[in-house]
């Protein structure tokens, strides 16, 4: 059964028999308060890291599934607001856990990646649509001019008709060439934007995966520290209780403070 802050808070030691040496109650209570505060902080830090790993998993899944979504769907993703760090525990003589790294703004990077992809897609569609509209207009104008010129040429002479048809064919060929060139340029721009957006998306997702790996390693370190901390605390308390029960009544009572300090120093050295 895991040790909880409530267990440390509610622990009670029986007083030694008359004539037996015992620890100072105030010092024992003060030490237990330090243990309770540190254990509470470790549990809260562990829970916070679990929550951040879960949030990174959700952000990674959302970024993968929303890579081709519209800008309206992308704007509905909530921005990540980091939770405040827990209040630091009071100074204590036991081993202190390593400092927690700052929470990365991982959700902002996922939102930016999705928006870049959406913007690239919108720009490509807009360029393609504009180029097609211009090409259709050029073809329509060219056909109208050609028909008018052919009608006028028929009324004048066969020579004028032949010349008009040649000019009409030339205009149609030029319009077709220009429309194909504009479509090709628009497609090249769209492909370049898409490739750049995919590259940025891959870089951002790689950063998110690295941050997730770091947080998972940090979580495992905290788990190991918690297990070692509980084991050392339990061993220390059991050894002190056993030593207290084995000591005889011949030693002076006022030497308890020195033995407390000695045992407490050994416990600190073992943790360090």
UniProtKB/Swiss-Prot annotation:
Is Phosphoprotein set as a keyword in this record? yes
Q: Which UniProt keywords apply?
A: Cell cycle, Cell division, Cell shape, Coiled coil, Cytoplasm, Phosphoprotein, Stress response
**Purpose:** Important for maintaining cell shape and cell wall integrity by localizing peptidoglycan synthesis to the cell poles. Protects PbpB (PBP3, FtsI) from oxidative stress-induced cleavage.
Q: Which family does it belong to?
A: Belongs to the DivIVA family.
Matches recorded under Pfam families: DivIVA (PF05103)
What the record says about disrupting the gene is:
Depletion causes a morphological change in which one end of the cell becomes round rather than rod-shaped. This phenotype is caused by the absence or dispersal of peptidoglycan synthesis.
**Domain of life per record:** Bacteria
Give the span(s) annotated as Disordered. 1-22, 62-109, 243-272
Kindly state the subunit structure of this protein: Forms homooligomers. Interacts with PbpB and CwsA.
Task: State the CDD domains in the record.
Answer: ATP-synt_Fo_b
Coiled-coil portions: 30-67, 139-206
On induction, the UniProt comment says: Positively regulated by the stringent response.
Q: Which gene codes for it?
A: wag31
Q: Please report the organism this UniProt entry assigns to the protein.
A: Mycolicibacterium smegmatis (strain ATCC 700084 / mc(2)155) (Mycobacterium smegmatis)
What lineage does UniProt assign to this protein's organism? Bacteria, Bacillati, Actinomycetota, Actinomycetes, Mycobacteriales
Q: Which residues carry this modification: Phosphothreonine?
A: 74
Q: What residue spans carry the Low complexity bias annotation?
A: 62-76, 94-105
Q: Name one GO cellular component term.
A: cytoplasm
Give GO BP annotations, semicolon-separated: cell division; regulation of cell shape
Q: What is this protein called?
A: Cell wall synthesis protein Wag31
The places in or outside the cell where this protein is found are: Cytoplasm
Post-translation: what modifications?
Phosphorylated by PknA.
The record's section on InterPro entries has: DivIVA_domain, DivIVA_fam
């Amino acid at each position: 059964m895991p040790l909880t802050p409530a267990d440390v808070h509610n622990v009670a030691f029986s007083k030694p028999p008359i004539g037996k040496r015992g620890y100072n109650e105030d010092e024992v209570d003060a030490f237990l308060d330090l243990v309770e505060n540190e254990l509470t902080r470790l549990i809260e830090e562990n829970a916070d890291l679990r929550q951040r790993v879960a949030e990174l998993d959700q952000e990674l899944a959302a970024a993968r599934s929303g890579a081709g979504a519209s800008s309206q769907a992308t704007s509905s993703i909530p921005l990540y607001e980091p939770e405040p760090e827990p209040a630091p525990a009071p100074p204590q003589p036991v081993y202190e856990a390593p400092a927690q790294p700052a929470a990365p703004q991982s959700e902002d990077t996922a939102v930016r990646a999705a928006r870049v992809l959406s913007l690239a897609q919108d720009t490509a569609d807009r360029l393609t649509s504009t180029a097609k509209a211009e090409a259709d207009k050029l073809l329509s104008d060219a056909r109208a001019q050609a028909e008018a010129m052919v009608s006028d040429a028929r009324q004048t002479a066969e020579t004028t008709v032949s010349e008009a048809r040649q000019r009409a064919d030339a205009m149609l060929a030029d319009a077709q060439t220009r429309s194909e060139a504009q479509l090709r340029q628009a497609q090249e721009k769209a492909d370049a934007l898409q490739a750049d957006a995919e590259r940025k998306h891959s870089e951002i997702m790689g950063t998110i995966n690295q941050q997730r790996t770091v947080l998972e390693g940090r979580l495992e370190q905290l788990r190991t520290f918690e297990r070692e901390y509980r084991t050392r605390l339990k061993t220390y308390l059991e050894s002190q209780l056993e030593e207290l029960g084995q000591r005889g009544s011949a030693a002076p009572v006022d030497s308890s403070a020195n033995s407390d300090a000695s045992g407490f120093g050994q416990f600190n050295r073992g943790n360090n």
